[in-house]
Amino acid sequence: LPIQKPDSAIERLQSKFPHLKITYRNVPWTKDRAQLEKEVPKELWRDATVLLTLSALPPKPEDAPLLDFIQLFSAGSNQLASHPIYTDTDIPIATASGVHGPQIAEWVIMTHLIHTHRYNQLYEAQKESRWAKDGYKVKDSVGMRVGVLGYGSIGRQVGRVAKAMGR
């Protein structure tokens, strides 16, 4: 994963399941398979039975003969669609679909408020001690209609938050 090693989470897993061998690699996120192959030595794949990853996979299915399950941290798996593990094996691949709704809905509402309240323009004016007489025509969004394209976990959460805010 392209994040700092989660020592406390790994320690909790090890204490609960002492028979597990956990190997953590900080691998930058990339679609470049050649770079991924350099980041993870082939010998690490040989004994892997479960893989938790964003995009790093063994170069070929035979490089990980014991691999039984792959958990992606992404909501989708399209970044792996042409990989031989994805196309030529029956190894189950699970995604994190559905877990990102609250965070992305908050981002959507935040960017809507930044836009309708002209935050960027007002903040720049504030830094320069300039005060606009018309307030840059800030809009209240109560009563505005919100269109949601796609009604998955993210779209549903955006709708719930927007409704709670009077949209």
Label the model's feature ranges.
Residues 134-167:
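Rossmann-like dinucleotide/phosphate-binding beta-alpha-beta segment
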Residues 19-21, 66-67, 90, 143, ...:
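A generic structural signal for alpha->beta connector loops
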Residues 27-36, 49-55, 125-134:
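Short gly/ser/thr-rich secondary-structure transition/capping motifs
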Residues 1-48:
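N-terminal glycine-/charge-rich "phosphate-binding" loop or analogous flexible N-terminal tail
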Residues 46-126, 138-139:
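Phosphate/diphosphate ligand-binding glycine-rich loop within oxidoreductases
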Residues 10, 36-40, 55-59, 80-81, ...:
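A generic local structural motif
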